[in-house]
From Swiss-Prot:
Region of interest (Disordered), residue spans: 91-123
Signal peptide start-end: none
HAMAP family, A to Z: UPF0251
SUPFAM superfamilies xrefs: Sigma3 and sigma4 domains of RNA polymerase sigma factors (SSF88659)
Domain of life: Archaea
Family: Belongs to the UPF0251 family.
Taxonomic lineage from the root: Archaea, Methanobacteriati, Methanobacteriota, Stenosarchaea group, Methanomicrobia
Listed name of the protein: UPF0251 protein MM_1448
Pfam families in the record: DUF134 (PF02001)
InterPro entries: RNA_pol_sigma_r3/r4-like, UPF0251
Biased composition (Gly residues): 104-115
Chain intervals with Basic and acidic residues compositional bias: 91-100
Species name: Methanosarcina mazei (strain ATCC BAA-159 / DSM 3647 / Goe1 / Go1 / JCM 11833 / OCM 88)
């Protein structure tokens, strides 16, 4: 059996678990979505890249990207339809820098297996143009290409910002 090629991941979501809002019942089942599967969905649907472009960004073949995207969509659909929790962790991935840091200079890269590998958010590609908005006070500033909004602190209150 051929070894799996580690995928290039340029973003890692700060949240690791999503659960249905259901105060009356306990969530008994959980779906595991790998970090590289989440990256496939992000590149395809949020950055609106073609499968060929997204596969190139992840440094994998287009057919491998297509399988990862299909698997991710099946998992998320199953969780939404059947009220299951989604846990994000693991997968075979690496972050862009070769000095064991992620795209924003945070956390280890390299190993790429399991929780805690490849920490870091944002990245060199920067995504489409737009604004960063403060989660606390609502202050907006233009997005700087190549700098993740999550790495920008609000000029007014110092809170982290998110992409609008």
């Amino acid at each position: 059996m051929r070894p799996r090629k580690r995928r290039m991941v340029d973003f890692e979501h700060p949240e690791r678990q999503f659960r249905p809002f259901s105060p009356e019942s306990e969530i008994s089942e959980e779906i595991l979505l790998t970090i590289d599967e989440l990256e496939a969905m992000r590149l395809s649907f949020l950055e609106n890249l073609s499968q060929t472009e997204a596969a190139a960004r992840m440094e994998i073949h287009q057919s491998t990207f297509q399988r990862a995207l299909k698997k991710a969509l099946e998992k998320v659909t199953d969780a939404l339809v059947h009220g299951k929790a989604i846990r994000i962790e693991g997968g075979d991935y690496r972050m862009p820098r070769g000095d064991r840091t992620g795209p924003a200079g945070q956390g280890p890269a390299g190993g790429g297996r399991g929780r805690g590998q490849g920490k870091g958010r944002g990245g060199r590609f920067g995504g489409p143009e737009g604004n960063c908005i403060c989660t606390a006070c609502g202050y907006e500033t233009p997005h700087t290409p190549g700098v993740s909004c999550s790495q920008v602190k609000c000029e007014k209150c110092g809170s982290p910002m998110v992409r609008k």
